[in-house]
Amino acid sequence: LDEYSKYILYIDKYQKKLLMWFDRLTLDVQQEYALKTVLKKPSEYVTWKLEWERKIKLFCDSSARGVYIYGTGVYGQATLELLELWGVRIAGFIESNPVAAEYKNYPICKVDDIANGLCVIVAMDYKNTLSVSEFIREKKLNVLYIWRYFLII
C-alpha cells in the first residue's frame, strides 16, 4: 500500500463517533505522518508552508464582505487561531447543523442561510470536505480548501 492508503486505513481503524475527538486524532495522525516528510526535506517544507500561508492571506484580503469559516471543529478552531494571529477578522462560521448560535463571539450560520458568492474557508478534514462539496457548488461560493495545510503545520 502507498503511504496515503496506509494513512486512510489507520484513520478508519480508529474512527469514533465523537467528531471532535476524531478531528483531533486525524490532525495528530496527519502531522505524525507528515513529520517524516518534513524531517527529510525541511527547506521544501518551509517553502510549502509559506506558500500556503500566502494563499490563505491573499484569499482573506480578496473578500470585501468578509470571510466565513465552514466548520467549528478542530480544523475550524485552528483556522480561526491562525487568522487571528495574522490580524484577520472573520465574518462568522458556517455549519451544516449548528448546535450553538456563536463561537468566540462570531455568529454561526446555517448553510441554508448563506448568501451566494461569499468567500469561505472550508476548514475540515478531507472526508468532511467532500460531504459539503455539493452545497458549495450550489451556492457558487468562492472557496479555499485548507485541509492540506493542516497535514503539516
Residue ranges: model-predicted function:
Residues L1:
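C-terminal "capping" alpha-helix adjacent to the active site of nucleotide-linked donor transferases
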Residues Y4-I153:
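Hydrophobic, well-ordered beta-alpha structural blocks that scaffold small-molecule cofactor pockets
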